[in-house]
């Protein structure tokens, strides 16, 4: 499935009953969040609020509010098909040369997909049908949502921030929330290790005193949006990955006021700059943990130009205690992670990030254990292999007879196969999510690994328990007479 832009995707969703138009006037201040939250928790459709109170621009919410809609956005029919996306990423992360003619033939589809990686640069684009600049720039005319009662101000949530470091050819796309503080001012909340922040740091070192160009795209096509939240290899741009998902090159256009390239079909683009030293206190905001976060200082983004499509749609979301849209994205992207991990660690059978663990803070791994200490190796591998898991506080490792996605199984393994002193790994002074207020120091805390596998010689000196198994012949005999027994009739 190929979607040229967000509107193509919305047309498909509406045809499949996955989009609901809301014509009743609804306030972007708290009310849209209340409706979107109730709808998402019920597994409902994406919502297009056509008449937000006080605004002439519609608001799109819950676009990726079910795992299936995430899969559709990636060009797949269902969530299970996302494993194929993961296999492609695993191949791109560590490509292997063909071993012979047959292997070359088998790999041809992957090599063919790589041809769609370069971007296609356009001279003009839908996202520049209207250009607003100078004193006419007014972010207050966009229906930016206030999601929770104690939020500091309206908050942009789904903006794709485009940056480029002074020594880099490829651009970085990142999603960072942005607090509205003036008609042309936003606070760019990016953490120091994220791509945009690193580009900014390099720029300040190379061009002291000069303004750092930044652009933010809102309402891009689904492949580009999802490319920005998927674990693409560092050598692959998000635009290139979006081209792989879509099956056609990503169309981009040069910004009006800077040399950055943005998705040509985006609904809205904010162009501007960040100046070194211009900071502002950001927050508090309710976030994906279910709590309001601390106030901290981040750079100020000054918007000099707004370009947009005719009849532009504002794409937004809310974050709160799971389930929310980030948690749903986590469930779907979980399937992408599995093949990537399995390529590096073939012994891994399954990998699961429970949504109630705030998408990434707890992971359950099942594996085919082969030697003493093997579980701890896998544990350390999860923390170090992909940067997405450096904030995972808890890793539980079980044998392959345990269903990683069934808490009944996992808790049984923990309580029967673990000795707390022997099988618990504690690692101190590691990177922790800035939003994790439970850590003793902001951004620095500990991690815990739980080895809930059967223990091998060298790990225990005791005779290990043998799991109870039914006699299959008895089971077959009872199956034959079960209906006759009429126990539940």
UniProtKB/Swiss-Prot annotation:
Organism the protein comes from: Klebsiella pneumoniae (strain 342)
Topology in the lipid bilayer: Peripheral membrane protein
EC code: 4.1.1.98
Entry's Gene Ontology cellular component terms: cytosol; plasma membrane
Involved pathway(s): Cofactor biosynthesis; ubiquinone biosynthesis
InterPro entries the record matches: UbiD, UbiD-like_C, UbiD-like_N, UbiD_bacteria, UbiD_Rift_dom
Pfam families according to UniProt: UbiD, UbiD_C, UbiD_N
Top enzyme class: lyase
Protein name, as recorded: 3-octaprenyl-4-hydroxybenzoate carboxy-lyase
Function: Catalyzes the decarboxylation of 3-octaprenyl-4-hydroxy benzoate to 2-octaprenylphenol, an intermediate step in ubiquinone biosynthesis.
Domain of life according to the entry: Bacteria
Compartments, record wording: Cell membrane
Cofactor binding: number and manner: Binds 1 prenylated FMN per subunit.
UniProt keywords, alphabetically: Cell membrane, Decarboxylase, Flavoprotein, FMN, Lyase, Manganese, Membrane, Metal-binding, Ubiquinone biosynthesis
PANTHER family tied to this protein: 3-OCTAPRENYL-4-HYDROXYBENZOATE CARBOXY-LYASE-RELATED (PTHR30108), FERULIC ACID DECARBOXYLASE 1 (PTHR30108:SF17)
One of the GO BP terms on file: ubiquinone biosynthetic process
Family from the record: Belongs to the UbiD family.
Binding-site residues, Mn(2+): 172, 238
HAMAP family associated with the record: UbiD (MF_01636)
Reactions catalysed, as given in the entry: a 4-hydroxy-3-(all-trans-polyprenyl)benzoate + H(+) = a 2-(all-trans-polyprenyl)phenol + CO2
Underlying gene: ubiD
Quaternary state and interactors: Homohexamer.
Residues that hold prenylated FMN according to the record: 175-177, 189-191, 194-195
